[in-house]
Curated annotation (Swiss-Prot):
It catalyses: an acyl phosphate + H2O = a carboxylate + phosphate + H(+). One of its GO terms (molecular function) is acylphosphatase activity. The active site is at 25, 43. PROSITE patterns: ACYLPHOSPHATASE_2 (PS00151), ACYLPHOSPHATASE_3 (PS51160). The keyword Hydrolase applies. Its EC number is 3.6.1.7. This is Acylphosphatase. Keywords: Hydrolase.
Length: 98
């Protein structure tokens, strides 16, 4: 049986609430880098933030827990989480708004 700590996961998050204009993307990038995750984060035109987070399953879950709170100025009202295909690269990027 595989060690659950070594199981890789990729999750696509859509974060809603007051999450733009409050440094949510920059904070998410710092948190993902601190945790050693790969992926990206970007603003959406509908006012939400979207993130693709890849790494060990337990660490991805820790990022998701952080995302429910976000930086101090944010007010997260909801997060949708879905499975995703992992990214090909390393690092965690802030992408342009889409």
């Amino acid at each position: 049986m595989p060690d659950p700590d070594s199981t890789l996961a990729a999750r696509l998050l859509r974060i809603r609430g007051r999450v733009q204009g409050v440094s949510y993307r920059a904070s998410a990038q710092r948190e993902a880098q601190r945790l050693g995750l790969s992926g990206w984060v970007r603003n959406r035109h509908d006012g939400s933030v979207e993130a693709l987070v890849c790494g060990p399953a337990d660490t991805v879950e820790r990022f998701i827990a952080w995302a429910h709170v976000g930086p101090p100025a944010a007010s997260v009202s909801a997060i949708e989480v879905g499975d995703a295909a992992p990214t090909d690269g390393a690092g965690f990027d802030c992408l342009p708004t889409c």
